[in-house]
Amino acid sequence: MTKPQINLQDAFLNQVRKENIPVTIFLINGFQLKGMVKGFDNFTVILESDGKQLMVYKHAISTISPLRPVNTSFSENKPI
């Protein structure tokens, strides 16, 4: 059997979406967007900010910074 491929990006985005964790998205041009992730696919992230929805293309994103730590199944502390 093959191991399932770990998709950390999807796990992270899904967790901030499900837990309504506010995020700051830093774009490659230096611009910052603050809001809540409402959805995502392979190419875009839907961000709700100030009552508006923004579709942000992933290729324009440099960093996504959550307001608080995100617990994904891949980042849990496991004994060595």
Swiss-Prot record:
**GO biological process terms, semicolon-separated:** regulation of DNA-templated transcription; regulation of RNA stability; regulation of translation, ncRNA-mediated
GO MF annotation terms = RNA binding
Q: Domain Sm: where?
A: 10-70
Q: What InterPro entries does the record point to? A: Hfq, LSM_dom_sf, Sm
Kindly give the Gene3D superfamilies that the UniProt entry links to this protein: 2.30.30.100
Question: Where does the source fall among the domains of life?
Answer: Bacteria
Gene Ontology cellular-component terms for this entry are: cytosol
Q: Give the keywords, sorted.
A: RNA-binding, Stress response
Tell me if Cell membrane is a UniProt keyword of this record.
no
The job of this chain, per UniProt, is described as: RNA chaperone that binds small regulatory RNA (sRNAs) and mRNAs to facilitate mRNA translational regulation in response to envelope stress, environmental stress and changes in metabolite concentrations. Also binds with high specificity to tRNAs.
**What is the similarity comment for this entry?**
Belongs to the Hfq family.
Please describe the quaternary structure of this protein: Homohexamer.
What is the designated name of this protein? RNA-binding protein Hfq
What species is this protein from?
Desulforamulus reducens (strain ATCC BAA-1160 / DSM 100696 / MI-1) (Desulfotomaculum reducens)
Q: Which gene encodes it?
A: hfq
